[in-house]
From Swiss-Prot:
It holds the Pfam family Ets. GO terms for molecular function: chromatin binding; DNA-binding transcription activator activity, RNA polymerase II-specific; DNA-binding transcription factor activity; DNA-binding transcription factor activity, RNA polymerase II-specific; RNA polymerase II cis-regulatory region sequence-specific DNA binding; sequence-specific double-stranded DNA binding; transcription cis-regulatory region binding. Transcription factor capable of interacting with purine rich repeats (GA repeats). Positively regulates transcription of transcriptional repressor RHIT/ZNF205. (Microbial infection) Necessary for the expression of the Adenovirus E4 gene. One of its GO terms (biological process) is cell differentiation. This is GA-binding protein alpha chain. It is found in: Nucleus. The modification Phosphoserine is found at S303. Heterotetramer of two alpha and two beta subunits. PANTHER family: ETS, GA-BINDING PROTEIN ALPHA CHAIN. It comes from the Eukaryota.
Amino acid sequence: MTKREAEELIEIEIDGTEKAECTEESIVEQTYAPAECVSQAIDINEPIGNLKKLLEPRLQCSLDAHEICLQDIQLDPERSLFDQGVKTDGTVQLSVQVISYQGIEPKLNILEIVKPADTVEVVIDPDAHHAESEAHLVEEAQVITLDGTKHITTISDETSEQVTRWAAALEGYRKEQERLGIPYDPIQWSTDQVLHWVVWVMKEFSMTDIDLTTLNISGRELCSLNQEDFFQRVPRGEILWSHLELLRKYVLASQEQQMNEIVTIDQPVQIIPASVQSATPTTIKVINSSAKAAKVQRAPRISGEDRSSPGNRTGNNGQIQLWQFLLELLTDKDARDCISWVGDEGEFKLNQPELVAQKWGQRKNKPTMNYEKLSRALRYYYDGDMICKVQGKRFVYKFVCDLKTLIGYSAAELNRLVTECEQKKLAKMQLHGIAQPVTAVALATASLQTEKDN
């Protein structure tokens, strides 16, 4: 091989990832785009250095020179994730950014850790062309594989890579619903939203044999179909059916949880490397993909269909309304710098009104939203019994409705819950020596604490 040939880069594509391959003296060096990631399952108690051995056969290159990092924080390859602060158990799915290009120190940067469901049921279809197998949604999750054999078996997450794929698919579409304001409950979907879901699943699972016209129906019609009717419409729709069942199971689990705990304050599992002393937050969340794990990454959603309210204020086919959105922010401990309760009588203040408007615009997919438009929308509530403007106080509004009757918690109770959750977060960060960003809420909290101490 000539030097020129050795220096020549050949662009190839493997598993959908663009790579550059250079061969010289039997050494293969591959370069990845910085934004590209690979997923890999690993036991939480296994030395993290084994990640290289797991990835090398897949990437077809040597990773000896690569450091292993957790969100850019270097890890000890001889110790497990558990020993370095990741407090969970079993097998986890890592989202790993492979950095291996000229001028940058090579490393494997773990961006996200996902905890898959503990148990799944695998339904294997005997005929890929005439799908007649019965899909069973079990307590945690469902996985369907097609390999030409006929049997049903229960497996653990340690033995199935597909478990994590389904967990990622469920979490991925949750984020898509969040981004576009699509109702969580499929029964509330419009025809366009049903088609959007079909296209998303087809892309996620590389499907090309689904006729979109067969599912040009509303979410209510979709959810009225039993498995047999669904497969008559979509002969090869096993994956679509399984994904739909997961979404519906998730909604049911969320509703069951809300019956026991009406407002759930976001308390994610924080992964904090024990050896890290950082001036900025360096935490990562373990996402539990179990259908029963209704406590996900957001503050609670308060849906009009989940809670009966006078006059059915939600409207818009289940889409979130402005009053719901504000209440959602008010129950999010991480949003207190832009909006917070004032006292215990239902008053709240937009500390950063333009930021609140921006968040509302993102939720409704309206990039031009600003506070002027938001305030006009709030005026529609003035004549009713939901929200009013507090006279003489700038950017201060008040819930005049009975929140206790509406959602089960009063404004005072909500304020107390969010405050307690924020204090727990601050205490945890202080325990691990991680500095808290200075915000108006943080300063106010510190000031109140000082007054109490004195």
